[in-house]
Amino acid sequence: MSQRGNGVMETDARRLEIDRTRMAEDLRGVVAGDVIFDDAGRSLYSTDASLFRLPPLGVVRPRSVEDVAATLEWASRNGVPVHPRGAGTGLAGDALGSGVILDCSRHLRRIIRTADETVCVQPGVTCRQLEAHLAAVGRCFGPDPANAAVTTLGGMIGRNTSGSRFPLYGAVRDRIVSAEVVLSDGTVTELRPTAVTNWGNAEGLTADAARRATLARGIAAVHGAAQDELASWAASGRLVHGGYRLDGVVCPPISDGAATLIDLPRLLAGSSGSLAVVTTVTLKTRPTVAGAAVGLFFFDSLERAAAAALRLQPLVPAACDLFDKRHLALSRSASPTFERLIPALAEAGLLVEFAGDDQAGCQRQLDDAVELMRRSRFHCIDVRRAEVAADVELFWQLSRTVVSTLHGVRGTVRPVQFMEDVVIPPGQLPAFLERYQDVLKRHSATALLYAHAGHGQLHVRPFADPRRSGERERLEALAADLVGEVVRLDGTIGGEQGLGLSRTRFFAEHFPGQVSVCREIKRLFDPAGLLNPGKIVPAAAESRPAWRQLPQTFPESVGLPLLNWTPEALAAEVDACNGCGACRADAGPLRMCPRFRESPGEEWSPRAKANLVAGLLGGEVDPQAAGMEAARAIADTCFNCHQCRVDCAAGVDIPALVTELKAAVVAAEGLRWTPWLLARVDRLSALGGRLRPLSNWALTNPQARWLLERLLGIAQGRRLPRFTGNAFLRWAARRGLTRPSRRAGPRVLFFLDTFARRHDPLVARSLVALLERSGVGVFIDPRQVASGIAAISVGDLDLARRLARRNLRVLTEAVRLGYEIIATEPAAVTAIQHDYPLLLDDEELPRVVAATRHATDYLWELQQEGRLVGGFEPLPQRLLYHQPCHLRQHGGGQRTAGLLRLIPNLSLDTRPTGCSGMAGTFGLDHDHYRTSLRIGRTLLTAVREPELTGGVTECSACRLQMEQATSKQTLHPVVLLAIAAGLAPKDALSGDNLRPATAAGRVATVPAAEG
């Protein structure tokens, strides 16, 4: 019976696979955009920022309104649900479903036109993109979600986003003028305010106008039939939030003989894409606010802070956010700046902003607020003020990083995104807090609370372990109890995060009359119920979506982990990714993710890798060859820059997860020729050194470079460094540096990288000279080999482990003898500190890791101790400093800049230039060459500026990129220091260790950015 059952299950699985294949083929026949129905691709869309995991049938990423219409027409004919999706950063599961995901964030990203008071955009444009665009003309949109860098306008419309500045700007529904939409049957129509006239007469109307008139008539009828329900709601004084909102949609005649006006586009706000799919939207804009002043008020209790928020409302603040003590404590621990800013004894805080066109007026309002707090009995224990733009922005980081700060809580018990977004009348805030504490006590729970206190929007996150048995039931009981208290205080749910999978049932339970009205509106727009079913209006056969938790045991066929960690540790790292989507930022202060910024598709995002590993571990993705081919394509979108690990608030080790993925792909399918070759770039460099001058001639010969590209896959257009052989080690041996030093005092083992050893020995000789002149003994063990970072980056674990073992023997001996380990190559430090512990199980590794640092960090320590060689001569140069990704993850860069500023007359430009795009051997590969240049566009453009005489960076790969499109020299910082100290020849400033890609010396141009 069991075998028969298994056979039936296998047959069903094959049938489903056949059906999916047929569906994908059908859609590819009518859609120009991306159609993704493979297991690996589907797994990326099985989560958002909520607790749920729900694999879709497939994914369509439309390129045009025609693609959207074709998809919905196909879905209507086949009875397949469609779930519109933006960035997938919602906390309620709005973007999840078992049908076809319609991802509008990949291609629909254009700002179409800007008028005096409006702007027309596609739904994939992010809030930050729009605001940056409008700021250039002195305008703004207004609603400001905390994750504005990643939240799309489509998602903001779906959730009716407001943000902290709701009192100043209102919500999205207040800003919509009109929208081009596709209805569930594939019909394209424009929704705009429509007069209800000639209801029964469609003669003379276009099809679009007739459809619009039908919808307007239907809404008017629903509104008329729901008068009792709407009147009852209004009489209660209850705030209107979740669901389809009719307030402000039906506008009565303004004069005798005038028609009732139905504001159809206003209905879209808060609809979670369940009425229509927006393809373009016209939004109102307003002038930017010229002045702002912010106060941070700290209190000795949450209750007093809440009472103070109410007392401040007559002053009409633009924003008033409330933080509890747990959030303040997390913020203090996450940032030294906030540690200084927030008093250790503060139990609660208020961020209060006054904004207007007059800066002096804003400051006077803040003065009034401070005086009010001092005269009142709210026990305000401290106040911080911000009245200049930089300080205002710093204070706002406390509010904007609320969610990301919570993500920094690691461990099984952490604040979970399950009962966010309840809304109460602001005057009820003190009463709610009392009941909130009672609810927590009844359920023996702890929670974190954050609120837009000025307009009554509250976000509650209980501490829980979603993997614990019975935890879901406990949280659901807690949520039900809390929602009950909210309703009793005339509150509601779904303020700015929608109802989604997590709150729709609570909405139906407490507000059945409202749900009946919503059901009629849904039937009018989407008769078949195929658009995002189960959101706002409960589905007929409502299922209970699974939480995104990994099974206790994994299928043996998965074969993971391949790195040196337990299955439990691997699962915990995957589980640490909460799907917040911050790694999808396409601009701003964070550097993650360079690949996503160049190609903004979900598979390029760091969180996609965590989702893919989760799919493998959970059995959703076939680990055999068929599944691994798609997995390879996703894993290859990461080039191991580690910026996600630096910038992720939760500190998820995505590079380690990607190494697991790539290793699994290599185990299943082997390594392709060019990656295999580039993993052994040190051997290639050694061979080139032995064959010089022939090899150096080949670097400049167009025919030879063409042949190299065809045979080896190394990009013909890439400028490559000359080969110098093993000259440095021979020089070091003559100096006695290849034997351990017996001298007293500090001693270092210099860990050589490929570039300094085989291409530019001046870097190595400069470091040795600086160290020796500073009284530091130097040892260069000739047994050391390449760090293995190139092999790690492509998933060649066999080679990486062999190299790591050989190096570990050398490094362990040195550490035992009291040596510290330094390297001039940041990626080599990454390999030792981050990757070797994942490759090898050796008790000596922690000591080796602790003893390893970058050369410039070590030199900075010497400078701080007064032991670094001094007397630097002036160098009249203006150089662009580029901070390498691998140095940034070690906290370096500022120390390098500090060292270089010791050189008189050296002007250093330290502007942020992002990732260079070279990424080790990534930019050498013909397949990635143009992508590499696009990623490095900002850096390449900067270094070309005529006032700059050259560049400086610690990373040899970044150096290659900086010299790719200019004749200017880029040097390692230690070379500049050695020149200024008289320890290296000054002609190195004008030298050129690179050969042009062709004999004609043609300079490569940067290709246009995608999209």
Which residues are covered by each model-predicted region?
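N-terminal glycine-rich flavin-associated loop
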Residues: 15, 27, 50-82, 104-147, ...
